[in-house]
Amino acid sequence: MTHERATTRPAPAALFLGFFLGCVLVAATAAGATCAGTPGVVPSADGTPIAYEVHGGGEPTLILVHGWSCDARYWREQLAHFAARHRVVTIDLAGHGHSGTGREDYSMRSFGEDVRAVADAVGGDRLILVGHSMGGLVIAEAARLLPGRVLGLIGVDSLHDLDFPVTEEHAAEMIAPLEADFPAACRQFAAAMILPDTEADLAEWIQADMAAAPAEVALSAMRGYMAQWITGAGPALFEELPLPVVAVCADLWPVDAEANRRHMRSFEAIVLEGTDHFLMLGAPERFNRALDEAIAMIKP
C-alpha cells in the first residue's frame, strides 16, 4: 500500500477507462456468508423509485454508491466487514439494479438526487459517501445537496486527476463503439480494466453483467459523465465542497494529488499495487483495510 502516486498523465483512452466504469460500494457477502440488510424504496426528486438496503449499525454512516452499468452487488465483499461497526447503506442508482427506469437524462446531478433521497429516507447527519469510478462524481453531486450532513468523500478507483483535459472528440471516440454494439463494446470496455490473473469466473461475471445493462441508460450516463469533464463542471463542483476527499485506487492509472488539491479542500490517496478497477471484488481484504484507513482519515 502506498500513498499519493502522482506521475505523468495517462493517454486519454486509458484515463477514460479509469474515470468511467464503476460501481459504488456494497451488496451482500463475505467469506461465503450472506449479510442480509433491510430493503427500502424511496422516490427520487423526479419520482423515479430508488432501491436501497441498510446493513448494521454505528456511526458514521457509510453510503456506498456504485458506478456505470453496475449496482449494489459489486460491493458484496464489503458488507459484513463494515456493517460490524457502521450503518452501511447501499443504493441502486436510477436505471440500475432494482431501481426504476424511464428517466430522460441519466445525468450526474440526477444520480446525486437519488443519493439525497436515500440519505433523507435513512436519516443521520454523520455521513461518509463512498463512490466507485463514476460514483466519485455522483457522491460530489450528492454532497452538494446534503449541506452539513456529510463528513467527507471517498472515491474508489476514481478522482485520479481533476485537471486531465477531456475534449468532445475524445468523448465521441469513447462513446461510438458503445452506440454501435453496446454488449460487445461494453465487454471489451470492462475487460480492459481487469487484470489477466483475476479469477476467471469473477472476470467473466463482471463483463457479462455490465454488458447486460440497459444501453439507453448506460449511454445517457456516459454522455452526462463526460460532459462534466468537458465543460469543467466536475472540478468546479469540488471547489464548492468544504469537505476532505480520500481516494482508494488501483495502480492502473496514476494519481495527480497536486492537481486535485487545486480544487479540493484536502485530498489524500491510498494506492493498492497490483490491483485493478474492481479492486473491491478482486482484492477484498486489502481493499477493506484501505477503506478502513480512508474512513479514519475523514472521521473526526
Model region roles, listed by residue range:
Residues T2-I63, R85-H86, D125, A212, ...:
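Alpha/beta-hydrolase fold catalytic core
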Residues A45, A80, T90-M134, V138, ...:
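Active-site loop/oxyanion-hole signature of alpha/beta-hydrolase fold enzymes
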Residues T48, V54-H98:
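Conserved HGGG/HGGXW glycine-rich cap/lid loop of the alpha/beta-hydrolase fold
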Residues A72-A80, H98-T101, L137, F164, ...:
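Short N-terminal helix/helix-N-cap motif within the alpha/beta-hydrolase-1
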Residues G124-F164:
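Conserved hydrolase catalytic core segment
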Residues D163-E169, A180-F238:
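Conserved alpha/beta-hydrolase catalytic His-Asp/Glu region
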Residues A212-V271:
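Conserved serine/cysteine hydrolase catalytic core
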Residues T275-N288:
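Catalytic histidine-centered segment of alpha/beta-hydrolase-like enzymes
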